[in-house]
Amino acid sequence: MDELIVDFNNLDSNLSIDDAKKYLQNLISRDKAIEINLKQHIKLKDDLEIQMESFDNEIPEYLTLSLKKSNELNNRISSTCQLAENLSSKVKKLDNIRERIKDTLKKVDDIIDLKNCIEGVQISIEKEDYEGAAFHINRYLSIDKSVLEDNSSEKLSIAEKKLLSMIESKYQQSLQDNDQKQVLRFCILYVPLEKPLEGIDKYCNYLKNQSKKLDAMITHYRNYIQSPKTIKPISAVSVITKIFEHFAAIIEDDLPIIKSEFGVLHCPHFILNITQQCDYYSSKVYDSFNDQFQTNKNVNDILVYKQQLEKSQQSIQDSGSGSGGGGGKVSEKIDPRNFAQFLDETSMISKATKFYEKYLIRKEHLIKSDIYQYYSKLEKEKIEKLNSIKSLIITNSRNQQLQQLPQPQQLQQQQQYQQQLQTQENKENELLKKLTQEKDKQMKQTIYSNVTKQKMNQLLGNYILLEEYFMVESVNKAIQMDSLQSLDFENNINSSNSNSSSVSGSGIGGSNTLSSSNSQQSQQSTDNTMIDFIFFVLQKSLQRAIDSHSIQTLNVICNRLCRILSQTRDNLKRIFREYIIRSSSKSVMDYQSSLQVLNNLETSSEYIIRLKKEFDSKCLKIYPIYKLDEKSKDLESSSTSSTSIEQQQQQQQQQQQQQQQQQQQQQQQQQQQEQQQENEFESNLKDDIIIIRNLLNLELKKKQENDRDQVNILSNEFLNCSKSFNKILQEEIESLFKSVQPRLKNVLNQFTLVNYEINQLEYDNNDINDPFVLQFTLEISHFFKPFQEHLSNTNYDYLVHQTIQFILKKIEGITIQQKKFTLLGGLQFGKDLRAISTYFTKISQSTIRDKFSKLNQISSFLILESISEVEDHWNENRNSPTWKLSSSEVQKILMTRIDFNHDQILKLKFN
């Protein structure tokens, strides 16, 4: 079309005829095209007009039909809603009528039951059918009080009292006959009479009568305390153990009966009653035990003695500072051996008490687990009932929303029904809350009596005080006896030295007479006895603390024991220093006493390690290692899967069918949710029961793990104490060696006088007449002799190493700074080093090769034939990890070779 359009403004005035014809033809084609388009539009207009006329005729008919259908549907829906409202109101009326009928029938049944109860009780009492009479009384107690008449209530109350009187009479008769079966029968009758605790008390009273045989045993024990020579011996340990075994057997045998006949909720009352009976007998034993050993008197005397001792020490300190007078009077010490038996038996009594307590804890966990399960079932029932009430509330509220303009009477009825449901829901919520509170209360309370535990703790408090006194005084007594015997020993030594000739020389002790040798053996035996006695006492005390099975007692005793060991270590250190000072002030130095102190330090360290091993092995049995199970902390919770509702029907176009389908879906979803909630609750109930059991076990395991941690801490204390003894031992050996270092001056002087600027003749002569090594070994042997005689092997070896290190250090300095060597002198120096090393290797228990490494390296440079070999030798060895010489030291060593040119030495490059 665009091609047919001609712009006349662009036509040229000089247009040719052919071009004009061409343009004319284009105009004709354009007109034809426009005419065709015009005809098409006219035809389209006609079609539209025809369609519009058709719509004007048909649309009103369709609209009228749709309006009619809509009105019919509206009428149907309205009638359906009205019918639903009427039906709902009638159903509610029927529900109310049904409830009233139920109440009426219940009252009728109660009246009939009341009549039967009155007749049945009288007949059962006449026949002495106590179980039947109790059943009728139980039924009477459960009847609604509103149907009871005064006359009927009075008759049944009289019958109840009469029945209780008869049961009491029969119970007393069975008690006298010691017939457990009949006693249990009449005690169980209190359960239907709604007096289960009274029944349990009566049964426990019977068990108490069965325990009277324990009175005879306690009487025997008391008589033995008063007349130990004429009465058959019996200990408090055996008495208390039999008491615990007796009552544990009662719990083990009768608890299942109480659980099945009286209910699990009354098991705690039974346990409490039995443990109170046990407390009665155990308290008698504890009191008699204290009377037997006069515990209170000993404790008071020790406290008074400690107070007087502190005042006396304070007075002495004040007197020393010039601010007070002399020390006050201190009462006589109590011999710790007087209550050694008390300590032994207290430990065993504590062990028996701990076993009894652990047994009660295990029973408590089992009972609480059953109680938790019982309350969980009740909670489940309450929750199910509460869910049903909530479902009714939701349904009623939905029906109210679907109703259109309900009548006032119907609206009022619906509101009343809704209020009833709300009231019932609140009531059930209160009951559920109360039930949960009762469960929590039952789970938190302790179901057994703690009097026995309290009595034992009081006894352990006295035990700890007496045990501390026993350890301290026994150790002090051993040290005092050792001091007295040491003074006697020194007097003997002085007297023997005055009768013997003193020998001068480089030795320490000089020559010893036979009497002095005997005195030395006596002193060594005395010191060993002191250490043995101290650790025997500490071992005994530690053993008692472990056997008590009380981690608190063990903790206190171990801490006190470690303090005593620390004091013993400090005393040994002080004594050693005093001996060193005394020995240094004498003309002939005698280190025997100080050497024995060093041996005592070593022996003490070994004893402590032995105590630690014994402590670890025994505590591992009593306080085993527990690893907390992660499954007990995080339990797998079972999850219930819910299947979605498959929609099988196709969606309908009509609104009524859609509403029906939605209602069906909502009902199905509600049922499915209720089923899912029930499954979840059952699963959660099982999980909760597992959880509460695991939590109780977890609590016990945590306590045991804490006890184990305390044991590990105490074990480390022993290890640290042993290390402190070893540290002091090394320090004092080093101190001892420093005090005797001047005695090695002659040995070092011999090396200073040795000439290493020798020729071949002198070198060969040295093989025949050794100028240094032989005399050196003799002097060293003489130096070591008293130490070897009196020191232990370990201490002696440590002193040897100290001596070797000192001598070699001095030889190293003399070699570099004072000596001059020829090649043969260097070879001689190497031979001397090997001879000295061989000698020291023989007298030493551990390797000494590393101590000679630097001197051997010095010797390796002294035997080089020429300076040209130095750099090669240096490069071969300088990267070795054991190489100890620096380049400057190597130059100094080479300078000692008289045959080497100093300028050439200085030109050496040590890269």
Curated annotation (Swiss-Prot):
4Fe-4S keyword on record: no
InterPro entries listed in its UniProt record: COG4, COG4_C, COG4_M, COG4_N
Region (Disordered): 496-523
GO CC, alphabetical: Golgi membrane
Biological processes, Gene Ontology terms: protein transport
Entry annotated with the keyword Transport: yes
UniProt membrane topology term: Peripheral membrane protein
Keywords: Golgi apparatus, Membrane, Protein transport, Transport
Pfam families listed in its UniProt record: COG4_C, COG4_m, COG4_N
Subcellular location per the Swiss-Prot or TrEMBL entry: Golgi apparatus membrane
Entry's family note: Belongs to the COG4 family.
SUBUNIT field: Component of the conserved oligomeric Golgi complex which is composed of eight different subunits and is required for normal Golgi morphology and localization.
Entry function: Required for normal Golgi function.
Name the record gives this protein: Conserved oligomeric Golgi complex subunit 4
Organism: Dictyostelium discoideum
